Amino acid sequence: MNWQIGGNNMKFLVVGCNGMAGHIISIYLKENGNCVEGYARSSSPYIDTVIGDVNNVELLKKTVVNGNYDSVINCVGLLNQFAEKNKSQAVFVNSYIPHFLADITRDMNTQIIHLSTDCVFSGKKGKYTEDDIPDGLTFYDRTKALGEIVDDKNITLRNSIVGPDIKKSGIGLLNWFLQQDDEVNGYVNSIWTGQTTLQLAKTIEYAAKYKISGLYNCLLYTSDAADEL
């Protein structure tokens, strides 16, 4: 893969660098001329990786504080049915860790780029804006809403994404679709306003380069995420 369009020479830490979003973000930022390191439970095939779990907050803190990063990208999350079955862990990963990262970098130049989800909204109202109060109903929805960082230094990006998994056994939509042998059912009168993981990586680099802060619904009707910021 070669997505390079001119480097920015920034230094990133991707927490959760082996996930569906994290590995594409890592590849894109590295190929675009940036210094990219990862934090995950296993080594990334693409970038240097600190082997650790987010439950090990001392190691995570040491990595972030000593790394002199321009931006730390938080890609970790406990999803849907896993959050429902492991509620205390879901609160820790989805709600606590983002604010922990913001707290330990408060007096540093490091920006936290936190990935949230459009699932903080139930979908009942439609046409949600950043000013709407999250009304998601599931435990996952609510823990992700609690984890959102809203301040004038860091940025939270609410996303709905699709992209390749790092493993063939991945459970993402694209992997599932590519494994089907027959026709698959679709939807009518529905609009999906999300983005690919590659487009998300471009959005993240733009936000990091210009130190954009706050809360953004990255639910796009165009392919240019930068215009939305």
Regions found by a protein language model. Give the residues of each.
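Catalytic helix-loop patch of NAD(P)-dependent Rossmann-fold dehydrogenases
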Residues: 92, 96-100, 119-157, 161-166
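Single conserved hydrophobic/aromatic residue that forms the stacking wall/gate
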Residues: 221-229
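SDR active-site strand-loop-helix element
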Residues: 15, 39, 75-76, 112-118, ...
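Rossmann-fold cofactor-recognition segment
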Residues: 43-56
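NAD(P)-cofactor binding segment of oxidoreductase domains
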Residues: 85-113
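N-terminal Rossmann NAD(P)H-binding glycine-rich loop of SDR-like oxidoreductase domains
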Residues: 14-28
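NAD(P)H-binding glycine-rich loop region in Rossmannoid oxidoreductase-like domains
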Residues: 54-93
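NAD(P)-dependent short-chain dehydrogenase/reductase
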Residues: 137, 149-206
